[in-house]
Amino acid sequence: MKFLPPLLLCACFIYAGNGVAIPSDAVGIDTPAKIKHARFILELDANVAVLKNLNGEIYAGLDNGKLYKITINSAENSARNSAAGQNFADRNSAANASINSDAAQNFNAKASVNSTRDSTANSAAVNSLANSTAANSTKQNSAENSTALNSARNSVPSTISKTLIFALPSSKNYLDEPMGATIFDVDKLGEKYAFLYNGDAFEKMLGVFAGGKITHYKLPMTGIKNVYFYDENTVVLLGLGSEILYFDLSSGKVSFEQKLTIASLGGSAYDRSSGTLLISCEGGIVFYFDAKAKKLMSQKSLHKDGIYSVALLGDRMMSGSNDKERSCYYENGDFAKFYNAHFAVFAVALSPELGAFTVGNGVRVIDKAGEIVRSIELDNDIINYLLFAGEYLVGSGYNRYIYFWGLK
């Protein structure tokens, strides 16, 4: 009987959260329904550093400092705009040359961050690119908001459109040489965008784009990985050391801070409707954090290795791990299931009816019951980002391409 209390503690830990029992074994990933090619492939002008579905809209942050909104047009609009899109694409090349030159000079002239303020002011907004950002974003939008699908494969120019939201000026590396200001995370609330990017000497910075201008903030600590809007005046920052920081935009100061674990941060997801922040770590644990109450609700030990990606939608959750035997975990409120992908699962995604996770040579799509219904084959690409958009599954690696797989 002396072993009973530890066993009870273990049982409580396993069933923590929503009461779904965690299975002990994993199922295979084979399925006969295969998709061999993407329906569309969008080629961008730089590598994709982050790809997200924000309030039903697709956004891609690139390693050249540009943020694009990606739109999947209807068949009717595609047919109507095809000729116009092609003509615009023909004019785009010549226009971009002069516009990009002017934009680069204008941005660089006004993008310097004021480092002469005291330490308190350094936490607040460092600089605001009010007029230059608005003007340059407008100029570049006119040249870059094309409906051209720039891939040689499966090219349908008027089906996919991209809209430039803003473009950051170049940063400088340790040798004072110009480099792209990589945008590596982004969130949106209303018409405000919060994003993380690499500034000079690879210093990570926070930016907020609203009303045609960008306000830059010094981050309160190094190693910030993710940003989420809590409200219009507050963002939640997640650190590599599994820190949660509430950052007040008006004062530039941290209003709340909590460290979840000593393990490094893995993937994260925020269900704004429920106020639940899902955070994972290298120890294979996921944490359910109540963003409104600012307290930890529960945690689950799911994998034996680090977790790369998580997704949360209502009572459904997925996690992708480096655990070779239990690579992917899925629960739908009634039951849970592990999948053995025989490879690290770098990305997972959920829609109201489906789920998806990467495998070594492609992607698997599951229904709400956890049954694999589609198998997407890839050549040599590694997919780091997955999301659902209408009847498409959308994915990208750290390259110039965004893939659109039709699911109907």
Where are these regions (language model features)?
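Blade-level signature of beta-propeller repeat domains, shared across WD40, Kelch, NHL, RCC1
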Residues: D379-K408
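A short helix->beta-strand "capping" segment at the edge of beta-propeller domains
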Residues: G19-N47
